[in-house]
Every structure is written in structure tokens, then in C-alpha cells.
A protein has these predicted regions:
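Short beta-strand/loop motif that positions the catalytic acidic residue
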Residues: 44, 49-52
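Conserved loop-alpha-helix segment in the C-terminal half of the alpha/beta-hydrolase fold
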Residues: 54-79, 99
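Helix-rich cap/lid subdomain of alpha/beta-hydrolase
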Residues: 1-40
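Catalytic active-site module of serine/aspartate enzymes centered on a nucleophile-bearing elbow/loop
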Residues: 73-104
Length: 104
């Protein structure tokens, strides 16, 4: 991915200097990541949580909403781009803490 595309589509919403550093240190995805086969989706039998990034330019937010609804996930919507973990750490941490405190 070009630096321009990374900054515009992948890291939109991230402070520009931080986004430039993220671009500089990224590495190619390991091909082995795509070699494995998933045999069972955990969301079919486990409670799930999902953060929809409303400004995501990498994954369409409508697709994110569809996936969250399909898995019956507890969902929050963030005014964030694809890297909501970086641009909205408190909101993402709150979602993780809610999931961690959930009793089945």
C-alpha cells in the first residue's frame, strides 16, 4: 500500500505524525496467515462485542454493522476510521472491559 493510500484510507482519523510512524514501521502480512482454516466461528456460541468505525475507509461501516448484527454482538459505534484502537483508545478499552466483565 502506498503511503498516500495508507494515510488517506487506512489511518484516517489518526494524528498525522502518528499515522506516518505507523506507515514507516508496518511490515508485510505473513503469507502463512492465510494458510490456516477456521473450523468453527466462536461468535456462533460465545457472546461477542463489536466496534463499528463509522468513518472506516478500509471496511465499509455497513458491512461492519451487518457482521455485528449477524453475530448478535453488543455493538458500539465510534466516530473513527479503521484504526479506532489508535484514535479512540478509551472507547475501545471500555468495550473490552465490558466484554471482560460479562458473565455468561
Amino acid at each position: 500500500m502506498s503511503e498516500d493510500s495508507f494515510l488517506k484510507y487506512f489511518a484516517n482519523g489518526v494524528e498525522p505524525k502518528k499515522a506516518a510512524v505507523l506507515y514507516a514501521v508496518q511490515e508485510p502480512t505473513a503469507v502463512s496467515l492465510f494458510a490456516g482454516r477456521t473450523t468453527q466461528a466462536a461468535w456462533r456460541s460465545k457472546p461477542s462485542w463489536y466496534a463499528v468505525s463509522k468513518q472506516d475507509q478500509t471496511i465499509n461501516p455497513d458491512l461492519e454493522r451487518f457482521l455485528a448484527k449477524r453475530m448478535n454482538a453488543t455493538t458500539v459505534e465510534l466516530d473513527a476510521g479503521h484504526l479506532s484502537l489508535v484514535s479512540h483508545p478509551k472507547e475501545v478499552a471500555d468495550l473490552i472491559l465490558a466484554a471482560a466483565g460479562h458473565k455468561e
